[in-house]
């Protein structure tokens, strides 16, 4: 599957009070994948928000991905992103079917990406590459890892961790396919700035 572009990831705290307006502003600027990431245990709220996001994604022809919840993804007929401790990738693939997007966190280890590919992943994700507000304690990953992954694992590569418009070009130059961005996109002061940033990230790819 050809996946390339901006991979927008929601943050419930960052987007409190402006959730849908900021997401729509990003979609208006151009988003390849939108990941709904919410660690809250309120299942009814998560279903409601994910359903609202799916409606927006369908309008803007963007693919929705659910973080860490294959059952919710199956219920909505969308993709899922799994961390290393978020359940079985083969089980998620079996549940969602062969056409669904299933992404895998690989931190900074190429062998995890090789295993993810064998297990049926659609794309592999690496990071953090820069200082991250979302995961400040995550170990840093060197830029040259992207080329190593490209040589050994022939899947789209998502990169994450402190990505801004200033440092994103380095990642693209090293071979990244998907720029996974949270604060660098949604940390804007208004919806117009979110759209501007989304367009600028998309233009890099």
Swiss-Prot record:
Pathway: Cofactor biosynthesis; thiamine diphosphate biosynthesis; thiamine phosphate from 4-amino-2-methyl-5-diphosphomethylpyrimidine and 4-methyl-5-(2-phosphoethyl)-thiazole: step 1/1
Single GO term (MF): thiamine-phosphate diphosphorylase activity
Catalytic activity, reaction form: 2-[(2R,5Z)-2-carboxy-4-methylthiazol-5(2H)-ylidene]ethyl phosphate + 4-amino-2-methyl-5-(diphosphooxymethyl)pyrimidine + 2 H(+) = thiamine phosphate + CO2 + diphosphate; 2-(2-carboxy-4-methylthiazol-5-yl)ethyl phosphate + 4-amino-2-methyl-5-(diphosphooxymethyl)pyrimidine + 2 H(+) = thiamine phosphate + CO2 + diphosphate; 4-methyl-5-(2-phosphooxyethyl)-thiazole + 4-amino-2-methyl-5-(diphosphooxymethyl)pyrimidine + H(+) = thiamine phosphate + diphosphate
Cofactor mode of binding and number, as noted: Binds 1 Mg(2+) ion per subunit.
HAMAP family given in the database record: TMP_synthase
PANTHER family: THIAMINE-PHOSPHATE PYROPHOSPHORYLASE, THIAMINE-PHOSPHATE SYNTHASE
The name this protein goes by in its record: Thiamine-phosphate synthase
Annotated organism of origin: Pseudomonas syringae pv. syringae (strain B728a)
């Amino acid at each position: 599957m050809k996946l390339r572009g901006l991979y927008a990831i929601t943050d419930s705290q960052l987007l409190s009070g402006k959730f849908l307006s900021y997401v729509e502003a990003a979609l208006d600027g151009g988003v390849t994948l939108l990941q709904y990431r919410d660690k809250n245990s309120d299942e009814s709220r998560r279903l409601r928000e994910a359903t609202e996001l799916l409606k927006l994604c369908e309008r803007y022809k963007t693919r929705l991905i659910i973080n860490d919840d294959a059952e919710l993804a199956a219920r909505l007929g969308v993709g899922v992103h799994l961390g290393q401790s978020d359940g079985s990738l083969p089980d998620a693939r079996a549940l969602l079917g062969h056409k669904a997007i299933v992404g895998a966190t690989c931190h900074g280890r190429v062998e995890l990406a090789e295993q993810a590919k064998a297990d049926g992943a659609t794309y592999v994700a690496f990071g953090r590459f820069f200082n991250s507000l979302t995961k400040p304690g995550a170990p840093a990953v060197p830029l040259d890892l992207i080329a190593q992954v490209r040589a050994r694992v022939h899947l789209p590569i998502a990169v994450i961790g402190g990505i801004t418009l200033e440092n994103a070009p380095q990642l693209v130059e090293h071979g990244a396919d998907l720029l996974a961005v949270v604060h660098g996109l949604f940390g804007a002061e208004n919806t117009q700035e979110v759209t501007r940033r989304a367009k600028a990230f998309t233009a890099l790819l």
